[in-house]
């Protein structure tokens, strides 16, 4: 049985294999993205059929090609057809043989409340936030020759409880791109910027 950890502040639960028990290897020794996506979708279809067709499966970018202990898949629900970033997802880590080594439930019960209509930021607002470094990104190492290859409007869910003890969804813009790492490999990245006007 895998050890379990619980974060009382967020309500997140994780089952995990201790790092020292994992066998490291080259990324090429692990199942391909397509193989793991099929595995995850089949399990969703079997155990959570209502989520199988409305979830996006995203692969965490591997920082290195060697000395890799696991490959992680994020299963992210959608709201009105838009991806939800932040802490509202499930992460599944696999070893070289395709066995699950960690399962992290990264969401807490959502207290349903009211909704409101908000204005979205325009290109000028977004550029100002980028210039002010008012964004978050999943870039694990310094990259050069970066280019933006895609754009999407999505949602972000707060990482912690707010003053009322529940969560809220906010619109965000997701800029996808790629750049060159120090070893010459091309790495993908995402930049998340608030899409609220003002």
Please provide the spans of the model-predicted regions.
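A short, surface-exposed interaction/processing loop segment used at functional sites
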Residues: 15-30, 92, 96-120, 188-198
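N-terminal start-of-chain detector that recognizes signal peptides
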Residues: 45, 63-66, 147
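Residue-identity detector for glutamine
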Residues: 9, 14, 35-38, 45, ...
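Charged, low-complexity helical/coil segments in non-catalytic cytosolic or luminal regions
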Residues: 48-49, 55-57, 86-170
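Exposed beta-strand-loop-beta-strand "reactive/processing" segments of non-cytosolic proteins
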Residues: 1-9, 52-97, 152-188
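Preferential activation on post-signal-peptide N-terminal prodomains/segments
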Residues: 1-53, 58, 77-81
């Amino acid at each position: 049985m895998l050890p379990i950890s619980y974060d009382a502040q967020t309500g997140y639960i994780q089952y995990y294999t201790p790092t020292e028990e994992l066998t490291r290897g080259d990324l090429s020794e692990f199942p391909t993205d397509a193989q793991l996506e099929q595995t995850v979708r089949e399990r969703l279809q079997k155990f959570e059929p209502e989520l199988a067709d409305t979830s996006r499966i995203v692969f965490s970018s591997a920082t290195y090609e060697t000395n890799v202990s696991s490959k992680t898949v994020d299963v992210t629900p959608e709201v009105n057809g838009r991806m939800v970033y932040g802490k509202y997802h499930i992460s599944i880590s696999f070893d070289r043989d395709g066995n699950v080594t960690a399962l992290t439930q990264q969401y807490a019960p959502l207290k349903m409340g009211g909704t409101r209509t908000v204005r979205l930021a325009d290109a000028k607002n977004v550029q100002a936030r980028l210039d002010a470094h008012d964004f978050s990104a999943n870039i694990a190492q310094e990259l050069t020759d970066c280019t933006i290859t895609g754009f999407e409007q999505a949602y972000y869910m707060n990482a912690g409880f707010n003053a009322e003890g529940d969560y809220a969804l906010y619109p965000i813009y997701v800029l996808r791109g790629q750049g060159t790492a120090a070893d010459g490999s091309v790495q993908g990245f995402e930049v998340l910027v608030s899409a609220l006007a003002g």
